């Protein structure tokens, strides 16, 4: 069953994301440090009439990496061609894409860490010197063809920057670390989305939604839609603070943005293992979730909010976790 707090794209959200996508830096809410840097780099590239250096955007899902890539293209006034690491299966696939680029174009590769190594190696000379050498044929009849490329900008997006190879990472001249959003920025995003979709919501309700959205605009917009449904059926269609509280309680999203699975992880650690340390494999078995799912989907937010610690001997529930769930804390 899909989690409403999953920060990956669900259902038709890709279309919804495009509808809500800001076009320029001044419309982009949050990520102020990244925006400030890109405003300078983009303007400098435009004044020199050069392509922008290659860009690596990294951070958790749902924080606007794809949106930022489109914003950069709009600010530069150039075309953007989009693909993803898993979609580029063979070196020939990438060569075909590169061969279609016009001078100054942006090639955006989402999930770039998932590209096969054989494909990644084609990028090295393309990024550094704007050419590729490709082999045609096989065996004794094989030959190398040199193909010059126009100057272009590669924007790579990843949720797993540590999985990038050193040679690929070194070829990005600009990096942008997308961080979890502050409450005030998420509140503004909720209110902007409500305006676009003609949803009536008061400021306190928007703030409550922001507080429980795990620092992620995609989750905030998803929760807004579900609370809108609740307000339409249970209330008079207007989203108030009270309606928001009731709807999120129905959705099992508590005041800290934890859902039933997050709470199950913490309760299991406290009730069965005295708060830990407990190994990831043991914890995964007890809550009937895959090890990678726990590590990649649930743990990051619990750690970021201070409910969970990773230690050399295992996971440990913090005093904040005990207090939040109403357990007496025993420091062992």
Curated annotation (Swiss-Prot):
Q: Which InterPro entries match?
A: AAA+_ATPase, AAA_lid_4, DNA_helicase_Holl-junc_RuvB, P-loop_NTPase, RuvB-like_N, RuvB_C, WH-like_DNA-bd_sf, WH_DNA-bd_sf
One GO CC term of this entry? Holliday junction resolvase complex
Q: For Mg(2+), which residues are the binding ones?
A: 66
User: Which one GO biological process term can you cite for this protein?
Assistant: DNA recombination
Q: Which reaction does it catalyse?
A: ATP + H2O = ADP + phosphate + H(+)
Q: Region entry Large ATPase domain (RuvB-L): which residue ranges?
A: 1-181
Keywords of the record: ATP-binding, Cytoplasm, DNA damage, DNA recombination, DNA repair, DNA-binding, Hydrolase, Nucleotide-binding
E.C. number(s) listed in UniProt: 3.6.4.-
Quick one: which residues bind ATP?
20-21, 62, 65-67, 128-130, 171, 181, 218
Primary localization class, coarse: cytoplasm
Region: Head domain (RuvB-H); residue ranges are 255-332
Which residues take part in binding DNA? 291, 310, 312, 315
| Record-stated family | Belongs to the RuvB family.
Name used for this protein in its record:
Holliday junction branch migration complex subunit RuvB
Encoding gene, per UniProt annotation: ruvB
């Amino acid at each position: 069953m899909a989690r409403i707090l999953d920060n990956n794209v669900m259902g038709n959200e890709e279309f919804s994301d495009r509808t809500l996508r800001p076009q320029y830096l001044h419309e982009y809410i949050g990520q102020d440090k990244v925006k400030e840097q890109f405003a300078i780099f983009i303007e400098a590239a435009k004044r020199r009439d050069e392509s922008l250096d290659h860009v690596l955007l990294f951070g958790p899902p749902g924080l606007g990496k794809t949106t930022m890539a489109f914003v950069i293209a709009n600010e530069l006034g150039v075309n953007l061609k989009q693909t993803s690491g898993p979609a580029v299966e063979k070196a020939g696939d990438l060569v075909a894409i590169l061969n279609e680029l016009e001078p100054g174009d942006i090639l955006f590769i989402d999930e770039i860490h998932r590209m096969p190594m054989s494909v990644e190696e084609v990028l090295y000379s393309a990024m550094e010197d704007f050419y590729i050498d490709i082999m045609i044929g096989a065996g004794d009849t094989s030959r190398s063809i040199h193909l010059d490329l126009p100057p272009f900008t590669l924007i790579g997006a990843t949720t797993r920057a540590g999985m990038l190879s050193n040679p690929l990472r070194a070829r990005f001249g600009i990096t942008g670390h997308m961080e979890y959003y502050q409450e005030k920025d998420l509140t503004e995003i909720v209110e902007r989305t409500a305006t676009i979709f003609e949803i009536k919501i008061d400021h306190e309700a928007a703030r409550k939604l922001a507080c429980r959205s795990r620092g992620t605009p995609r989750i905030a917009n998803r929760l807004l839609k579900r609370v809108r449904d609740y307000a339409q059926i249970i209330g008079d269609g207007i989203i108030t603070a009270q309606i928001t509280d009731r709807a999120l309680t129905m959705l099992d999203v508590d005041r800290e943005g934890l859902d039933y699975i997050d709470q199950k992880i913490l309760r299991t650690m406290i009730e069965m293992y005295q708060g830990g340390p407990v190994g990831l494999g043991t914890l995964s078995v007890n809550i009937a979730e895959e090890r990678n799912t726990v590590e990649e989907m649930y743990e990051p937010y619990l750690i970021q909010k201070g409910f969970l610690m990773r230690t050399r001997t295992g996971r440990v529930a913090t005093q904040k976790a005990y207090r939040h769930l109403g357990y007496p804390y025993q420091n062992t």
